């Protein structure tokens, strides 16, 4: 299917979603939101897509909301920004978090505002050395959205989350890695190849089990210790009944490469 604001491709078990509004630093307008939602919903249900990569075309990953798509007339009634969050941004973040397969974010250039927090919602973030993350909301008198106030303090701690969100300073990729906010940093010229290699590696793994791991890690933030070990028990019970578990054991015993199906 042809899209105006994104590029969607499938290759070797991986779905590649590229934000494609480079002249606007891949910032979101309503049409782009709708296209992204359509593709991610299709891939969530498609068993042939076993890993998803989200990236941005051009010199930046995503600058968040396209302010030109939301002109504020000082003489008009104030806009309801909560509607945009409820209708578009929150469903997008929930789709990424709940997707039953790994989601990798490849960040080149700037990831600002909602763009930074979309990256944080992904399971693994790989950034180019030139990349940076900016919680730009404070510069406009706004509050971080797209679950930024949930992900950020859990990733970097209270003090650093406060500093990043109150000051709106750029956080360079290598510092983001040192702080535990992202998984890895690579040379700019190697970003695409390194991410594709990692995505294809994950696509060959037992993705049903990986989806249960995602669930366990996400729920650990709010669970008590006792609740978490019970969750591990329940998820392990489910995993142990999967076809992938049987295949993994048989492959190990027979000293061959496993052929996982994601179920």
Where would I find each of the regions flagged by the language model?
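Terminal peptide-recognition signature
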Residues: 17, 21, 36, 54, ...
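Short, charged, surface-exposed hinge/linker loops at domain edges
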Residues: 214-223
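Crotonase-fold acyl-CoA enzyme core
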Residues: 94-210, 233, 237-242, 247-250, ...
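Glycine- (often His-adjacent) and acidic-residue-rich active-site loop
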Residues: 34, 56-95, 111, 141, ...
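Conserved CoA-thioester-binding segment of acyl-CoA-metabolizing enzymes
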Residues: 1-57, 94, 192
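Generic structural signal for alpha-helix termini and adjacent loop/cap motifs
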Residues: 22, 46, 73, 99, ...
